[in-house]
């Protein structure tokens, strides 16, 4: 809601929201309701599992999430944003202390396969 408020204050067609399902899982009471509220200002969507790993391997309800994106006619980008190896600089910056996935190449392949069911 804060992001939508900021968009309304700026009131420019090039200003919108990037929703990140990993963070929405932490911050939002209902991910799908939040997506519906963002409908007209949703410009980009980040996907990862609840542990930042392979989508579909954890607790997030991606069937409902992607059904909601379909309901609002979202046609923008969907980007994987996984931080799966602890020994990389980005993971150090995020304080990722353990490997989420052992093989990053397999993780990308499996994630792509999973997302291709929806998008």
Segments predicted by a language model, with ranges:
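Histidine-acidic metal/acid-base catalytic patches
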Residues: 1-19, 23-119
């Amino acid at each position: 809601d804060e992001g939508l408020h900021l968009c309304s204050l700026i009131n420019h067609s090039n200003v919108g929201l990037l929703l990140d399902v990993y963070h929405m899982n932490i911050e939002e009471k209902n991910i799908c309701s939040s997506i519906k509220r963002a409908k007209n200002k949703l410009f980009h969507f980040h996907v990862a599992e609840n542990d930042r790993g392979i989508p579909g391997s954890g607790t997030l309800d991606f069937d409902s999430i992607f059904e909601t994106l379909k309901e609002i006619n979202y046609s923008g980008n969907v980007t994987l944003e996984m931080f799966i190896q602890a020994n990389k600089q980005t993971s150090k910056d995020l304080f990722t202390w353990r490997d989420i996935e052992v093989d990053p190449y397999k993780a990308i392949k499996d994630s792509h396969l999973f997302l291709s069911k929806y998008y």
